[in-house]
Swiss-Prot record:
Residues 217-364 are annotated as: Required for mRNA-binding. Found in a mRNP complex with PABPC1 and YBX3. Found in a mRNP complex with ZAR1 and ZAR1L. The gene is YBX2. The lineage of its organism: Eukaryota, Metazoa, Chordata, Craniata, Vertebrata. InterPro entries: Cold_shock_domain (IPR050181), CSD (IPR011129), CSD_CS (IPR019844), CSP_DNA-bd (IPR002059), NA-bd_OB-fold (IPR012340). This is Y-box-binding protein 2.
């Protein structure tokens, strides 16, 4: 009986270990006691021992066989996708000439100098761009240096630079950067204290030294002119009352004290520029004709002027809108003066002249 039990135990152990090793799960084999197969019989005990471990094992390992395709798919990982950095490099530091490059679309082609092959280039592949250009680009007909890698649709260029690693020149259609400096936003500065409180601090006082130390730490605020549209709109604005005080006052010391007040009022409150000086409108100067001597004159009087002077009738005024009556006949006093005995003949020569034009006079 001992030999039959040993044979049954030998046949039971492989049946239990085969499915466990095929499934890849470690199982512990428990030895069958010698008294149990005797109850069911030798043949029955052997069959029970053989079927016992198979029934005790889970059904899942029995279905996972090496030939099952489900096991192969779940067991082997999928291959990783190839990234841009893992592209195989075909050549490095190759010189070529740019065939064409579209700045708007951001791509073009480079013709290799060694193999005369066209290589695709994208704007992201440009490593050293022109610092003056706003966009990355290469110029048409420019000689560049690049590396060739294998892309999805053919050869592609990467690490594009100028010959020797210098920056590329770039396309002439690419916009340039602005020449002005970049605007750096600054926090709003605290408004300085009014200058009125600083004027009495110049004298002796307990807090004068402390106030000077605080004011020296603050940086004086620089006045900035208002914008163009503000100047055009508020040129004739109301004038502050502080600006009129130095003009009305007679003391010369007042303008020196009130000058900083005007500046700070324009900076902090309104920033109104000083009004422009406009001269007062005046009529153009029109010289008036010189008036002839009246009855008070002595030697220069004429005969017709004496007639009305003797009476009560004054001499009529000359019209202003007729300038041709202002012409006077000037006569040299030396050679044309008549001697003493010729004075009685003066009425004969002067009568026909004054009869035609009463306004003309003769000066000696």
């Amino acid at each position: 009986m001992s030999e039959v039990e040993a044979a049954a135990g030998a046949t039971a152990v492989p049946a239990a270990t085969v499915p466990a090793t095929a499934a890849g799960v470690v199982a512990v084999v428990v030895p069958v006691p010698a008294g149990e197969p005797q109850k069911g019989g030798g043949a029955g005990g052997g069959g029970g021992a053989a079927s016992g471990p198979a029934a005790g094992t889970p059904s899942a390992p029995g279905s996972r066989t090496p030939g099952n395709p489900a096991t192969a798919v779940s067991g082997t990982p999928a291959p990783p996708a190839r990234s841009q950095a893992d592209k195989p490099v075909l050549a490095i530091q190759v010189l070529g000439t740019v065939k064409w490059f579209n700045v708007r679309n951001g791509y073009g082609f480079i013709n290799r100098n060694d193999t005369k092959e066209d290589v695709f280039v994208h704007q992201t592949a440009i490593k050293r761009n022109n610092p003056r250009k706003f966009l990355r680009s290469v110029g048409d007909g420019e000689t560049v240096e690049f590396d060739v890698v294998e892309g999805e649709k053919g050869a592609e260029a990467t690490n594009v630079t100028g010959p020797g690693g210098v920056p590329v020149k770039g396309s002439r259609y690419a916009p340039n950067r602005r020449k002005s400096r970049r605007f750096i936003p600054r926090p709003p500065s605290v408004a300085p204290p009014p200058m009125v409180a600083e004027i009495p601090s110049a004298g002796t006082g307990p807090g004068s030294k402390g106030e000077r130390a605080e004011d020296s730490g603050q940086r004086p605020r620089r006045w900035c002119p208002p914008p163009f549209f503000y100047r055009r709109r508020f040129v004739r604005g109301p004038r502050p009352p502080n600006q009129q005080q130095p003009i009305e006052g007679t003391d010369r010391v007042e303008p020196k004290e009130t000058a900083p007040l005007e500046g700070h009022q324009q900076q902090g409150d309104e920033r109104v520029p000083p009004p422009r000086f406009r001269p007062r409108y005046r009529r153009p100067f029109r010289p008036r004709p010189r008036q002839q001597p009246t009855t008070e004159g002595g030697d220069g009087e004429t005969k017709p002027s004496q007639g009305p002077a003797d009476g009560s009738r004054p001499e009529p005024q000359r019209p202003r809108n007729r300038p041709y009556f202002q012409r006077r006949r000037q006569q040299a006093p030396g050679p044309q003066q008549a001697p003493g005995p010729r004075q009685p003949a003066a009425p004969e020569t002067s009568a026909p002249v004054n009869s035609g034009d009463p306004t003309t006079t003769i000066l000696e």
